[in-house]
Every structure is written in C-alpha cells, then in structure tokens.
Regions:
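An acidic, glycine-rich "communication" segment
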Residues: 182-229
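Short, contiguous, pocket-lining structural segments
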Residues: 161, 180-181
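Intrinsic-disorder/low-complexity accessory segments
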Residues: 1-173, 201, 205-208, 220-228
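A short helix->loop->beta-strand "cap" motif at the edges of active sites that frequently abuts
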Residues: 175-177
Length: 229
C-alpha cells in the first residue's frame, strides 16, 4: 500500500488473507521475510471471490485504500509484562506511535485512524494487582505515576482521568476511528463509561469510599458492548 499497490483483505478466508496483483518485487519481499503466499491464476481468483460472496459463509472483502496511521495506548513506564501489541507491530515493521493519557486528554486521537489498547484498567483501580502486588515497587511506581499524571491534567482522581480517556476514545470511534481492544481493555472500558459520575473505587484506590448503591446507578446506555454487570 505504501507503494501504491491495490490490496484486498479477504476476511476469514484461510484465516484472513490478502489479495494483490502479481508483482515480482513483492514476491521477492515475501520470500525474504518468510511470509507464506500462493500465486493463483485469474480463474482461481474468481472462484475465491465467488466463495466469499456466498451469504452462508462468514467471509467478506475489504479494499484497503490507504495506509492507516496507528496509535497504541500504552504506558511509557516499564511494567512486568510485555506489550504484545507493540511487539507484533514492531516485528511486522508496521509504523505506530505510542500514546497514553496525556496525549488522549490533549486531543491527539483525531490524528490517527486506528487505536490499539489492551492491558489497561479504565476504572482507576490499577488492574487486579492490589491484593498480591501492592507492596511491589513496580506497582507503587505505577500508582504514583498515574496519580501525578491525573493531577497534571487537572483531575482529582485517577478514575476521573481514566473516564476522560474512555470518553475521548468513545468520541474517536463516533467520529469514524477504529478501535481494537483486548484483555482488560475491553471490559474495564465499558465499566468506566457506565460508572460516569459515580465512585466505584474503594478507599485503598482513591482515599475514599464508593458511592452508596453504586451498582444500581450504573448507566449501561453509555457502554459499547457489555451491560448488566
């Protein structure tokens, strides 16, 4: 695509394949990089397209018209686990920028076409680690960094900052941006949106208790995918 060559993405065909016109330079590149490929005749292409067009199969074709500008929502500090998304993108030599709360709150999201996120707790409770790792230096550093950033950006609590991030991401998607979320980035995201305006964080996370009857005050009309949690 960067070289102006048309590419079709064959969704769910052989695990998700790409269809391009034959090009010797591309074939050489595939060989060098160890990418599996198959050269097919026009008749075979027509059979593939016919198979994908069958309404009884869960397949589709998307024409890729531009190289998307990709952002990965990931903390700048080092945590005990690897960021799988950035590892894959780096290995595949796909350009991307790493952004986090400051960039999102600062209005940077509209500069991108695609946003990836995964290991994140948008509720402001620092993931599932408090019970076992609250004494670990990496956990304490993360809490300190998050609290300092919240204050820098004008928020009283980390949970309020994370809600602001979640709402900015929601607006990004409403404006046509693509979001790929996985791991805790999926469910904690909707929990934060549903809990807007109420406090669901216990004292050990933000210094005060939760809003009375917080469960009954969740607004599931604000979520993307989940409800009744």
């Amino acid at each position: 695509m960067q070289k102006g060559i048309e590419v079709d993405w064959l969704l769910n065909y052989r695990g998700g394949s790409f269809l391009i016109y034959y090009n010797q330079n591309i074939e050489n590149e595939l060989k060098i990089r160890g990418v599996s490929y198959q050269v097919v005749a026009d008749a075979k292409v027509n059979l593939i397209l016919t198979e994908i067009a069958n309404p009884e199969v869960n397949m589709d074709i998307i024409k890729l018209e531009k190289t998307p500008k990709i952002a990965v929502y990931s903390p700048k500090s080092k945590l005990p686990w690897d960021d799988a998304v950035t590892m894959v993108l780096t290995y595949a030599e796909i350009p991307y920028d790493v952004i986090y709360d400051e960039e999102v709150i600062g209005g940077k999201l509209p500069e991108y076409d695609w946003l990836h996120l995964h290991h994140e707790d948008f509720t402001g409770q620092y993931g599932r680690f408090w019970a076992n790792y609250r004494g670990a230096s990496w956990y304490q550093d993360d809490v300190r960094n998050q609290e300092n950033m919240a204050k820098k950006l004008g928020f009283n609590k980390v949970s309020q900052m994370k809600l602001g991030v979640a709402q900015n991401i929601k607006n990004f998607c409403s404006g046509g941006g693509f979001l790929f979320a996985m791991c805790s980035g999926t469910d904690s995201y909707d929990i934060a949106l549903a809990a807007a305006g109420i406090d669901i964080c216990e004292r050990m996370f933000d210094g005060d208790g939760i809003t009375p009857n917080a469960q009954s005050k969740l607004d599931f009309s604000q979520t993307f995918a989940f409800q009744n949690f």
